[in-house]
Amino acid sequence: MIAVLFNMVPLFAEEYEISTANTTLLLETSIGRRVNFVYYGPRPATPDEIYSTGSDIRWNAYPCFGTNCTCEHALAVTHANGDVSLELATQDVKQYTDPDGGRVWEFLMKDKVFPFYVKQFYKAYDECDIIKTWTEMWHTEKKTITLDKFASAYIPVKSGDLYLSYLAGGWGAEAQLFEERITRGRKTIGNHDGARTSFNGNPSFMVSLDGPAQENSGNVLGGTLAYTGNYDLSFVKNGNANHLEITAGINAELSQYKLDPKVTFTTPEFIFTYSTEGKGGISRNLHRWGRNYQIIGGTDSREILLNSWEGVYFKVNQEGMNAMMRDFAAIGGELFVMDDGWFGDKYPRDNETTSLGDWVVSTKKLPEGINALIDEAERNGIKFGIWIEPEMTNTKSELYEKHPDWVLRQPDREPFKGRGDTQLMLDLCNPEVQDHVFGVVDNLMQAHPRIYYMKWDANMSMNNASSLYLPKDRQSHLYIEYHRGLMNVCKRIREKYPDLIIQLCASGGGRLNYGFFPYFNECWSSDNTDAIQRLYIQCGMSHFYPANIMASHVSASPNHQTKRVVPLKFRFDVAMTGRLGMEMKPSDLTEKEMEFAKNAIGTYKSIRPVIQQGDLYRLISPYEEKPYVSLMYCTPEKDRAVYFLFRRSYLRDTWEDARKLAGLDPDRNYMIREINAADPQKKVYLDGKVVSGRFLMENGFRLNLGQDMSSIVLELIAQ
């Protein structure tokens, strides 16, 4: 009997080494046994080094509730007969290479009693030091079962002096960085909004393994969940296990999923990485992966655009748009985007209370139509874009009058209304609504095929959590099926219009998430365009997302949100750290300011490849609350770099520290040039100097900015 058992279950598990250029994830399993998570961290010379140093964990790689699992679990189900137990055992392991070059491992597991199956995937991207994981699950039980929890990933981390870095915030204050020590208990980063899932938090984190996180040194684990809906990241540390347990996945609260036989449920992808170069190393890994593998058009150059919103708000008219385009083209602009206020026939869009859903041009506002605007744009040598909010409607609209059953609402309650006390969300669980939302883009493109860019907005939370389309016993599917419907629409759009540039917007940066970026080229970072505030917002974003998705616009002074007066140079220099744009009427600038703006736009064009495709080094964070903020970008080849220094406030008794750089080649010399100078005839003393990369990184230079909201930009060119 014992001999037969040994033949069925091997005595020793087989190791599966999932390695990238600098990291290794080590798993072990054998047929009939569970998959164990053994190690994740710096790549060893051999796996023996992991064991000989006590670095192995050997913990269940995907713990299931119900059988000897009192720790955090990744999966919990209720079977058709009411049983809540699971015990997964490996049936098969496969390895192959995807068309994009990523290497994939599949672990097929089955419950030891019930015909319930889980396939766990790991995909490695060598040059980015990125691994992503997700699961598929299905069953062949006779009746429907319930998925009570269904995480994408479970990662155990050896206990130590652990610190958590994450983003949180709200409208006008997105992506604020928070850092705290991980103590015993549970820390959760989650979202229940349903639509705008990045205001309260962001499904991304870093864990420093050896004390407070440092920018360019130290061991750090980072991760992000690529999911557009409600999510949950949990960090659990207790006395029963000598490690931190991290789970990431769909927020299962109010989303229990009834899974029918032979139907496959797929969890979102969780992307994780490890670096011995601190938080900066995590950021650079994610940026590189995002640009090359996740963001549509991620390696393409992004145009410098003017958005009409803060210039005219709802006061859109033919001559006003033409004038803005002419003025912007005159200073070197490349793309004009007409924001809210252009549509509505029966109900012209004069304010926020009407017209959403009626995506036809308002002949009252634009009697010559959109094609005439595109003609004017092309006469001035620029491209044309337009704003839409296709997931929404107003109660005062032709769409709502025709299809009141298309909105999310409880059948026996008055719906809660959003913006303007008239806005409602459409029910994207409904295939007819999906066709309508696809048609918003398709009809515009069919009528105006020269539209180059669309800004896709979403200005309401999912406040009415009920679908008139879903069956009564599947209402808990709402949060999941809505986003499945949205992704279905996005896929259809991309299949038909692969080259259309689409900006992701949700009352600002409310949808900052890698789950959207296979379909959206960039993100509107925040409705708050104040340059000082943007230093914080864009620094937070940069921890996980690259500069080329970060729409950063120069707006009026005083700023419309904060009323702060900020010099034009400072506003441009801050905006240049992302994808440069403008959010104002150029005609409001003086002649001297117009000349500066023209030169600044020309300067950005010359450094655009470095900013949008370079490696980021955060040198002085705004969250350090020092007078200065500093960052720089270097090309991967280290032949060009751009350095930014901002002075927020002047403190007379503050000594000037040496400005040490990062990311340069220590064995090359660099010519330093001041660019975007306020006065080209009065450049900084460093202009024209040649200094070695080693000296610039180890010693740095002294540079004093003598007043509030002053800034300087330096370009470094390898000799």
What are these language model-derived features?
Residues 65-88, 217-231, 274-295, 333-340, ...:
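Glycine-rich, aromatic-flanked loop segments that form ligand/cofactor-binding clefts
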Residues 203-207, 215, 622-666:
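Carbohydrate-binding surface patches
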Residues 649-719:
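C-terminal beta-sandwich/jelly-roll accessory domains of carbohydrate-active enzymes
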Residues 22, 135, 262, 377, ...:
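Conserved, mostly hydrophobic/aromatic
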Residues 367-369, 401-403, 407-569, 579, ...:
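Active-site neighborhood of glycoside hydrolase catalytic domains
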Residues 297-439, 448, 453:
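Aromatic-lined carbohydrate-binding/catalytic grooves of carbohydrate-active enzymes
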Residues 85-88, 257-276, 709-717:
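Short Pro-Gly-centered flexible turn/kink motifs
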Residues 14-27, 31-238, 253, 669-685:
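Polysaccharide-binding surfaces and accessory modules of carbohydrate-active proteins
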